[in-house]
Structures are given as C-alpha cells and as structure tokens.
C-alpha cells in the first residue's frame, strides 16, 4: 500500500512508526531518500556560504577564496527563470559545472545561465519528468502565468503499449513565454519534457512550440505530438478563445451544485462520474442543446478534455457565452481527488474513480 502525507518518525525492530502515530509492520526498510550535501569542510575552511546553505560561488564556480573552486550538490546556484539563489542536487548540472570550472582555471570564459531543474524518475511503473517552473513557483516569483493540462495518447492509439500521458505546460501571460512543464505516464515523458527544457533555455514561446517539427512514427508518438497539442491549447487560452477551470476547483463546483455536463457516452458515465453531473453525450448534443441553460455557468468535461472542447466550441457557435471547460477532465479529476481523498480521509466526489 502507498501511504502519503505521513512521514516516518521511528524505525524499530519489527515495525515503523509514522508521524501520525500509526504503525506499519516491517521486516526490512529501504531508505531511498538520497544524501544531504556536506558543506562542513567548506565552512571550516572559512568559505562564504550562501543564503540557501550552499557554498557561495561566482559565475565561474570560484568560491570566496580565489584559489578554491566548488561544483556539484554542495554549491549555491541560481534559478535561470527567477534569478534567485537555489540548490540543485543533480548529476547533469554538476558535470557541466566541473567543465566550466576547469575552463575558468585556464582563462576560458563561461556562459553561466543558471539552472532550470530538468529531472525524471520512475515510480511504480509510471515515468515522471519536470523542467523549469511549476505554476505555484511561477506565481510565487511574481510571474503572471497560466497553464494547460492535456492528456493525449503517448503514441498512436492502435499501437501496442499506447497509454495516456498527463502533461502540464506553464507559460507567461501575455507573452506566451514557456516557463516549464511536468509530465507523467507510462511512455517517454522524458522526451517531451526535454523538448520543453530546450524551449525554456532558448526563451521559446507557445507559438514556437506549436510549430516545432518533431520526429514522428506511430510506434514513437503521434503526428501532432503531446507538446504540440499542449501549445495549441495554451494558445487558445492565451487568446481567450475559450475558458477553463483546473481540476483543483472541481470539488468546490460539486459542493456548490454547479451545472456540470459530462459529454462522455452513457456507458462511460455509468462506470463512474461526478456526483450531481448531467450526462449529455457529445453524439447527442445537437438534439439536447435546449437542456443546457444560458443563465448560469456551465462546466463541461469528458475523459481527457478533447470531446468537451469540441462540445464547448459547438455551444459557443450556438451563442453560449457561459460555457467553461474543465482542464484535465475525468481522468485528471480522478487522479487529483483520489490522492487527496486518501491523504485527507475525505468523502469522494465521484461515484467511482477511473484511471484508464
């Protein structure tokens, strides 16, 4: 079982005790938590320490002692996007820092642009990757931003192993400058996030990403790649072509008894749906448009937001100005709600979760 939001307090002979007081039987414990960087030697040597606790270095990785250079996990770096001091314990940046420091010793100039924190990992058969700023950190840094959450297939649907990829793209408003991305799925999420890392490093915009030509074969991806699709949706949001709300607001909408339309087919709806939602399949929308009010906000969703987008545009074409798409739709809602329901022990807002 997976336990979230409850840290380990003590490890005993036959069990571990969590911060909540709960105990878990255990014959063996693997601590996959990494090692904290050690700066004790630097402090003892009188080197200046930065505000984040890392060794303070200049753009060439020279410390406060002109005869000492420092690189790697123990140093303080700066965030490329915000310009603020940061720490980053990753092998890739450490290797680049080592090369730059060696060059500096020989008088070769270094173009130190800071870090964007590109990273990836695998957890229980799922791959996750991220780069740049997430939405929370962008707002914390005072950068006006927005985001889109898309869930396209990671390759052509008829290919073996095709699976949904959850992809979130963060961009600056109103410039469209790409700030970062996060992705999770069973496929090559690192490939997509690497593309965004390159765009971030070159100050690329969603327009650049929309037109980016990438490798395509049905076994590797789709003709309109995940990142291209995210850029198209982002452009629609940036230019006000439609409105959206994130999955984080759906619980409030359900509790407020908002008018939520599920445009999936009846069979999909019966397997699991938002409590209080109305099922009007996209295939029946023309005949049932009069069931949708114009005097209050209407929130649309499907499985992954593609059909609900089509429904929204059709309704806007019929004069509806009160329709809003739920970004991430039912797959995104279920993942977000399940995690928080387990962590907080709260009542679910769906009849059944659906993760596929």
Where are these regions (language model features)?
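Generic secondary-structure signature for well-ordered alpha-helical cores
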Residues: 1, 47, 76, 103-110, ...
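A conserved short coil-to-beta-strand element within the FAD-binding core of flavoproteins
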Residues: 4-13
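A short, polar/charged loop-to-alpha-helix boundary motif
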Residues: 187-205
